[in-house]
Regions:
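A short, N-terminal "cap"/entry segment at the start of jelly-roll beta-barrel domains
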Residues: 1-35, 43, 119
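Double-stranded beta-helix
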Residues: 3-9, 14, 95-119
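Glycine- and acidic-residue-biased ligand/ion/polar-headgroup-sensing regions
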Residues: 29, 48-74
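Short beta-strand segments
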Residues: 32, 76-78, 103
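Conserved short histidine dyad/triad with adjacent acidic residue
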Residues: 33-54
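Conserved GNAT-family N-acetyltransferase fold
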Residues: 34-36, 61, 86
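Short beta-strand segments in beta-sandwich/barrel cores
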Residues: 41-42, 66-71, 94
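Short acidic-glycine-tyrosine-enriched beta hairpin
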Residues: 72-92
């Protein structure tokens, strides 16, 4: 089997305050590209849509551009930037650092299937 899709014709796009997500769905892979503008913060932009106090999505990500700070519910905190690959468990907040747009590729299905999606 060979299956190919392009983000130029994403299966879906979700807009949220100060950002958006584009997703493609393939057999065995749901892939998302999230774009966050300066000033974006999960608790302000997505929490009202998700209805939770912190992000409950599991992420497997690669940062294409920009910087983002992530704070876990247990207080652990770190910053990611271009070229970083990271895994982030449910239960976190995140925000753009600086005045550059942040672009993240997420290979974990839940981001592509449920992130910033109203019920």
């Amino acid at each position: 089997m060979l299956e190919i899709k392009t983000l130029e014709k994403a299966d879906e796009r979700r807009d949220f305050p100060r950002g958006h997500l584009e997703a493609v769905h393939l057999s065995g892979l749901d892939f998302a590209v999230a774009t966050f503008e300066p000033g974006w913060r999960w608790t302000e932009s997505v929490a009202p849509i998700a209805g939770t106090e912190s992000c409950q999505i599991h992420h497997h990500c690669y940062v294409v551009q920009g910087r983002m700070r992530i704070r876990m519910d247990d207080g652990a905190e770190s910053e990611v930037g271009p070229g970083d690959v990271f895994v982030c468990s449910p239960g976190h907040d995140a925000w753009v650092v600086g005045d550059e747009q942040t672009v993240v590729y997420d290979f974990a299905g839940p981001m592509a299937t449920g992130y910033a999606k109203a019920d």
